[in-house]
């Protein structure tokens, strides 16, 4: 079997006046993530991991932050489009593992919803999608609550490989 592993990363600044959307879940908080789209840091990291595993570039190549068509875009729509492109390139998505690093708010109550959204968007059973939440132990810009970061890994299998 031809296995492919991809790694994804994203970070966005926290600002007032924007909703906080992570993993397709709107989380009650006084600030949200700044970005061209809905700035869903988790879905962007997963999208990058999938594109990377398939050697299809990155999220910016497919959904440019300078393209008005993606202004305010729902990152779940982008993730579904990514999955379609990965499948069209002859790959099957096996699993996704991810970590969100945020000093606040607490994300644990929202992880089940995030996992369900990601599994649905990728057409995977829930047990093949994992989301972890960590703080940065008050260190650096993440620890000061200036932004939220996400990291992801994805495993693909090339069909006929």
From Swiss-Prot:
- Does the keyword Acyltransferase belong to this entry? no
Record-listed 4-CDP-2-C-methyl-D-erythritol 2-phosphate binding positions: 10-12, 36-37, 40-48, 58-60, 63-67, 102-108, 133-137, 144
Site annotation (Transition state stabilizer) points to 36, 135
The record lists a divalent metal cation as bound by 10, 12, 44
Pathways per UniProt: Isoprenoid biosynthesis; isopentenyl diphosphate biosynthesis via DXP pathway; isopentenyl diphosphate from 1-deoxy-D-xylulose 5-phosphate: step 4/6
Question: Which branch of life, at top level?
Answer: Bacteria
Under which name does UniProt file this protein? 2-C-methyl-D-erythritol 2,4-cyclodiphosphate synthase
Recorded source organism is: Burkholderia cenocepacia (strain ATCC BAA-245 / DSM 16553 / LMG 16656 / NCTC 13227 / J2315 / CF5610)
Q: Which gene encodes it?
A: ispF
């Amino acid at each position: 079997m031809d296995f492919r592993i991809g790694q994804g990363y994203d970070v966005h600044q926290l600002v007032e006046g924007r909703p906080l959307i992570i993993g397709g879940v709107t989380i009650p908080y006084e600030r949200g993530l700044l970005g061209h789209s809905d700035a869903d840091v988790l879905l962007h990291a997963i999208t990058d991991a999938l594109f990377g595993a398939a050697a299809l570039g990155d999220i910016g190549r497919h959904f440019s932050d300078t393209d008005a068509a993606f202004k305010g875009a729902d990152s779940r729509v982008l993730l579904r489009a990514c999955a379609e492109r990965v499948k069209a390139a002859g790959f099957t998505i096996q699993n996704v593992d991810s970590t969100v690093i945020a000093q606040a708010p607490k994300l644990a109550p929202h992880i089940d919803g995030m996992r369900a959204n990601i599994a649905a968007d990728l057409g995977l059973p829930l047990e093949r999608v994992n989301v972890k939440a960590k703080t940065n132990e008050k260190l650096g810009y993440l620890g000061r609550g200036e932004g939220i970061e996400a990291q992801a890994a994805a495993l693909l299998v090339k069909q006929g490989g």
